[in-house]
Structures are given as C-alpha cells and as structure tokens.
Regions:
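Short beta-strand-plus-loop segments that form exposed binding edges in beta-rich domains
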Residues: 105-112
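Ser/Thr- and Asn-enriched, surface-exposed coil loops between beta-strands
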Residues: 40, 81-86
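Hydrophobic residues in beta-strands and at strand termini
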Residues: 37, 50, 79, 92-93, ...
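Glycine-rich, low-complexity segments
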Residues: 1-30, 51, 58-60, 64, ...
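A short beta-strand element within beta-rich, extracytoplasmic domains
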Residues: 42-53
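Short, surface-exposed tryptophan/glycine-enriched loops
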Residues: 85-99
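Extracellular and analogous surface-interaction loops
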Residues: 32-42, 93-95
Length: 126
C-alpha cells in the first residue's frame, strides 16, 4: 500500500466493504422488503435509522437470505426513547450471498405509528 517513494501508507480498512440500502415505508407494519446483492460477499452487519417516533411497542427487523435467518436473531428498534434519527446496529456472523441473490428485510408490525426507516446492510466482499 505504500507509494514506493515517501513511505506513506494508505488504509484499506474499508476497501472491501459494500453497503446496500433499503427504504422501509412503515417499520410499524408487517412486511417484506427486498434488495439484490450486486456482488458476492458476506453480510457482516446491518443498521437502521428511523424517521419518527414508535408508539406502543418495539419494532423487530430480521434479514433472511434464501429463507435462512441472517445471524442468530433480529434487531429490536425500541419504542421507549425513540425519535427521528435513532440508530440501531447489529453485527452478525458472516452470511454468504452470491451476486444476484435476493436479501429479504422483514418487519414484524408490532409497533404503532407510521414511521419510515432506512436499513443499511454491510457486506464484506473481500
């Protein structure tokens, strides 16, 4: 990674990271949302940011690839203290995906209030 002359090194820490984004119209409604993996790699985590306040109950998100759960459990977006801009993140055990494979984001519909959310799925494509 050095330039050969100055001895300066460039970090490659994120060189093999690819982020997929999924927009959810209402995290409080039970539904499935889909995104296609453009390259082969491993899902290593995902994050959610909400655009409002959840009321009554927590929202749970899960990811599936080919009907198999990504990681050991889903992500809980707590209604207590929720507000626009609240971010939740889950690290997962690496789940392999192939280029062109569908990734499903599932909402459980157990919270109330119409709240949009943005999901970012982190892939390691090294």
């Amino acid at each position: 990674n050095g330039d050969g002359a100055s001895g300066t090194w460039t970090s490659t820490a994120n060189a093999y990271k690819h982020i997929l984004n999924v927009s959810i119209t209402d995290i409080s409604s039970a539904a499935s949302y889909w995104v296609v993996a453009p390259v082969a790699g491993n899902i290593v985590g995902y994050s959610c940011v909400i655009d409002g306040v959840l009321i009554t109950g927590d929202a749970t998100l899960t990811l599936e690839v080919g009907g198999t759960l990504v990681g050991s459990s889903g992500m809980t977006v707590a209604f207590t203290g929720s507000a626009a801009g609240t971010v939740d993140t889950v690290a997962t055990t690496a789940t392999a995906v192939t280029a062109g494979q569908a990734i499903e984001v599932i909402t459980d519909g157990l919270s109330t209030n119409v709240v949009r959310a943005q999901i970012s799925i982190e892939m390691d494509v090294s």
